[in-house]
Amino acid sequence: MIYGIGTDLVEIARMEAWCRRWGEKAGRRLLTAAEQAEFAAHAEPARFLAKRFAAKEAFAKALGTGVVAPALLTAIGVGHDELGKPVLILSDELAAFAAARGIARMHLSISDERGHALAFVVLES
């Protein structure tokens, strides 16, 4: 059964401004440690940040809490499975919070085109 659905659209120019403002610290405020390493090596850091930010916001909306503890941006990670499909990776605290609410499966889709990044999350119980 569907627990929640969330979507988010991010303007890549917004993340470009974020990167200019925060410089090397830009990723630390939004990303997990694993994502920060990927961000530092990415050819298009603002696009990378926009896609990750959209995914995290979409997850928080699907969860129904918004971005508040324990669903903080740095507790919600995005990785890829062996085929390259995007997957959500939660901190231990957030994973326990989700499990306590009966969430058994998480689905994530991310897309970007020119000036925007979009993410869609479905949580199942």
Swiss-Prot record:
Keywords: Cytoplasm, Fatty acid biosynthesis, Fatty acid metabolism, Lipid biosynthesis, Lipid metabolism, Magnesium, Metal-binding, Transferase
Enzyme class, first EC level, given as a word: transferase
Family of this protein: Belongs to the P-Pant transferase superfamily. AcpS family.
Organism field: Chromobacterium violaceum (strain ATCC 12472 / DSM 30191 / JCM 1249 / CCUG 213 / NBRC 12614 / NCIMB 9131 / NCTC 9757 / MK)
Cofactors (names): Mg(2+)
This protein's record includes keyword Transport: no
Binding site for Mg(2+): D8, E57
The protein, known as: Holo-[acyl-carrier-protein] synthase
Principal subcellular localisation of the protein: cytoplasm
